[in-house]
Curated annotation (Swiss-Prot):
Record's function text: With S4 and S12 plays an important role in translational accuracy.
GO cellular component, as recorded: small ribosomal subunit
Domain S5 DRBM span(s) in chain numbering: 17-80
InterPro entries with a match to the protein in the record: Ribosomal_Su5_D2-typ_SF, Ribosomal_uS5, Ribosomal_uS5_bac-type, Ribosomal_uS5_C, Ribosomal_uS5_N, Ribosomal_uS5_N_CS, Ribsml_uS5_D2-typ_fold_subgr
This protein's encoding gene: rpsE
Keywords tagged on the record: Ribonucleoprotein, Ribosomal protein, RNA-binding, rRNA-binding
Family in the record: Belongs to the universal ribosomal protein uS5 family.
GO terms for MF: rRNA binding; structural constituent of ribosome
Keyword Hydrolase: no
Domain remarks: The N-terminal domain interacts with the head of the 30S subunit; the C-terminal domain interacts with the body and contacts protein S4. The interaction surface between S4 and S5 is involved in control of translational fidelity.
Quaternary structure note: Part of the 30S ribosomal subunit. Contacts proteins S4 and S8.
Name the record gives this protein: Small ribosomal subunit protein uS5
A Pfam family annotated for this UniProt entry: Ribosomal_S5
Length: 172
């Protein structure tokens, strides 16, 4: 099966969400009469203010697969709390054989991330972050690992509430 990496495309609609297509794969289903060709698309959608969603779609034609993926990404959006355009703290995300390390960065650093991770941070509204991926470089696994790490991230207020202390005690 041939694999095609699509260019990352951005499309702003009237709802203010940013959309990026991460990859499109050509897939085949072998049946008695031969092969049935189809396409699988992977996309991310964000609002530029910490909300992010991932979707995948399959269809016989590329535009239909991409539209299905975009619709799923819009339905599955989650909120991630950011701190001045970067992450709250260093975090590691895992999915399958993919492991992703994400670190907050000071102002002016930019988004230092490869492939699918860069698309996620751009649609999310993160402007300064440093990332490193280990293991699997499969786009689907990297996106899931990145989202896993972002969902593990907690704010100083949440940590203080868990420990029964004030935010000032936590921050030192």
């Amino acid at each position: 099966m041939a694999k095609m990496q699509a260019k990352v495309q951005q499309d702003e609609r009237d709802d203010g969400l940013r959309e990026k297509m991460i990859s499109v794969n050509r897939v085949t289903k072998v049946v008695k009469g031969g092969r049935i060709l189809g396409f699988a698309a992977l996309t991310v959608v964000g609002d530029g203010d910490g909300r992010i969603g991932m979707g995948k779609g399959k269809a016989k034609e590329v535009p239909v697969a991409v539209q299905k993926a975009m619709d799923e990404a819009r339905r599955k959006m989650v909120k991630v709390s950011l701190k001045n355009g970067t992450l709250q703290h260093e975090v590691v995300g895992k999915h399958g054989a993919a492991k992703v390390l994400m670190m907050p960065a000071k102002e002016g650093t930019g988004v230092i991330a490869g492939g699918p991770m860069r698309a996620i941070f751009e649609v999310m509204g993160v402007t300064n972050v440093v990332t490193k991926s280990h293991g699997s470089t499969n786009p689907y696994n990297m996106v899931r690992a990145t989202l896993d790490g972002l969902q593990k991230m907690s704010t100083p207020g949440e940590i203080a509430a868990k420990r029964g202390k004030s935010v000032e005690d936590i921050l030192g």
